[in-house]
Structure formats: structure tokens, C-alpha cells
Swiss-Prot record:
Predominant location: membrane
Compartments in which it is found: Cell membrane; Plastid; Nucleus, Nucleoplasm; Cytoplasm
Tissue note: Ubiquitous at low levels. Not detected in mature siliques.
Classification via Pfam families: Tub
Residue ranges that the Swiss-Prot or TrEMBL entry lists as coiled coil: none
InterPro entries found in the cross-reference section: Tubby-like_C, Tubby_C
Function: Involved in abiotic stress signaling. Tethered to plasma membrane (PM) and probably bound to phosphatidylinositol 4,5-bisphosphate. Abiotic stresses (drought, salt, H(2)O(2)) trigger phospholipase C mediated PM dislogement and plastidial and nucleocytosolic relocation of TULP3.
GO cellular component: nucleoplasm; plasma membrane; plastid
Domain of life: Eukaryota
Disruption phenotype: Reduced colonization of the roots by the mutualistic fungus Piriformospora indica.
Organism phylogeny: Eukaryota, Viridiplantae, Streptophyta, Embryophyta, Tracheophyta
Species for this entry: Arabidopsis thaliana (Mouse-ear cress)
Family in the record: Belongs to the TUB family.
Gene: TULP3
Protein name as it appears in the record: Tubby-like F-box protein 3
Amino acid sequence: MSFKSLIQDMRGELGSISRKGFDVRFGYGRSRSQRVVQDTSVPVDAFKQSCWASMPPELLRDVLMRIEQSEDTWPSRKNVVSCAGVCRNWREIVKEIVRVPELSSKLTFPISLKQPGPRGSLVQCYIMRNRSNQTYYLYLGLNQAASNDDGKFLLAAKRFRRPTCTDYIISLNCDDVSRGSNTYIGKLRSNFLGTKFTVYDAQPTNPGTQVTRTRSSRLLSLKQVSPRIPSGNYPVAHISYELNVLGSRGPRRMQCVMDAIPASAVEPGGTAPTQTELVHSNLDSFPSFSFFRSKSIRAESLPSGPSSAAQKEGLLVLKNKAPRWHEQLQCWCLNFNGRVTVASVKNFQLVAAPENGPAGPEHENVILQFGKVGKDVFTMDYQYPISAFQAFTICLSSFDTKIACE
């Protein structure tokens, strides 16, 4: 039997095992994609009957590598996820084979949404807004969002208005978008005016993160992060909007301080922190904590201008790319390379602000762009050093009404 036939036979058996023993539930398409990845395994009896149970490790690794290389786009990439769900040995091999998005430009497992995007190329996504239930859905889609092409569901966010702020709860499962869900991965919180936002991650990015309880002054130092710690609120970014001097037709002025990413990450040879494991904890079994980095900059104290305290601490700061005036259209324009088709004050492109001195070529690269393509449909393209989760939260901040800025 040829190697190609071997792989095809393996895929067929994986599909049979998947239908009988477990549900991958990493759906593709809007009608079926409102699901969350479940790290389930095949019943032992079902797998023992398979001829793949006794396959030599070297041959198994070779077969899995062939599958990973050939199934590089969704929905066929679900076969890679299926392989990881067979048993612990298969999972470990697949985890070694599947590279992070920074190197592979692929989103495979849920943890990929918390890892920096690829270098030098944008991951093309789009956001669908449901006005009736104040929910936002993030999809991975290489084609125009306005086409009939269904995208791969990634994240969901639900808006909750409070007396003094607004929260956007973010989940891996759009059917259960709440703080108490075990698929909760973070949130975005705005101030009363909707001009300043804080992005919270449910788990720390930096192993040296310090934890503080909101109703107590006790400080708990964590020398290393345990995968068993409860989900909390770790600030990883702060977003501020300023007065729009270009008027209502120009893009909003915004600045993003990335607490978890050093400014050197965008320089040649620079690196950004990368999470390796998602924590799925039921918040009902833990006390309510609120977590803060010891050196994080609070949203209320964010200064304006590029020479802020954030840059003095060596944090990455993202700022608006300056638009140009279009004489024919009589409006301010940005080059979205065809990814944005409808003029909107929400449209923006973000680049890295230089730490000191003049801007280098790395500060001209668009790290995140967001824009409107139809009613309640928006494109979101991002790249290294930010993750899909961070990009999604920044884009969510653009949906809020900002009377004080316009």
C-alpha cells in the first residue's frame, strides 16, 4: 500500500472514530460554527480495535506530519485536531508538529488565538455584529467577508452595560458567553465615557505576574504560573481615544499600550511572550479575584502622546497610521488594499510607535487594521506581535460610542 493510500485510510478511520467516539466541535461555517473546541478523547475500546494503536512511533510521526502539512486550511484542518484527540501519545506528537502561528501562519488549536500572529503577513479575519443581542463573532476567513464563503468561527464577545462602565465578555463558545463559563478567556472594560479601555486576560502572559485581590491589600507573589490557577483578570493592554482633530469624517485618534509585549518585539530579532496552554477553570469553584500586573499602567492615568510612561518602561505602543486627504472624494483615506469598502469613523490601521528617535521601517508595518465592508460586517487583519484575542479586543473598543472624542 502506498504512503498516500496509508494516509487516506488513516483519515477515513479517524473520521469513523470521530463520529462514533467523540465530537471535534471545532465547527466550520456560520450555521455550524457556534461551538467550542473540546479536548476529548476516544473511548479505549474503540481505539484498541484500530490498527493504528500499535503503529511504531517513528511511522506515526511521519504520517501525522504528512497530514499536518497537507491539511493547512479549514475545514480540512479539523483532521489535525482529530488526530490530537485520539489519545495522549497522539496529542503529544501533534503538539510537537504543529508550530505556533508566528512560524506557521496557521490557527489550529484554541491556544493559537492567544499566541502572536505571523511575521510579515496579515491573518485575515472578519467580525459579524448582532445588534439584537449585542454579540460580536470573530471568524477566520481568507475571502471577502461579504461573500457567501463561510468562515471558521474563532471567538465571541457579548456586551454588558453597567452603571459606570461597559464590559465585553469574550469566550471560545458563543452559546455560553459569561464570566462563569469554562470557555471564558478574557474581557474588555471601558470607562463611563467610552474613551479608555482595559483588556483583561483570564490567565497571565508573564510567568512573573503578581496577583492582587481587589478587596484586600494582600499581595500574592507567584514565582511561576500553574495551569491549575483560577481564571482571573490580568491586564494585558490599555486603549485610549483622543479628540478627533480631523472632524467626524476622519479616523479616530487612538493609542494602545500593550502591557505584555515589549517595544523591542517589532525590532529585528525581537520576541513577544507566547502562551503555551489555555486554562479552563470553572469560576464558580473559586473566589472572585481581580488580578493586576505590578507595573501595569492604569487606563485612567494613560498620558497622551508617543513619549508616554509606557514607552519609558519599554512597552509596545500602537498608534494610528496617519491618513491622507483624497481630493476627489473629499475625505481622509487609508490604503486597506481592498479589505475595507465602506467609509466609517470606526476604520483604522495601527502601527508601532517608535521608542526613541526617528521611526524605522518596522514602524511602517500595519500590525492591525479594521474596517467596514457591509452592514454589521467588518474585516480584522492582524500580524505579529499581537494575538487574535488582543486584536479582537482592540477592534471591539471601536464599536463603543465616543461622544467626547468626536
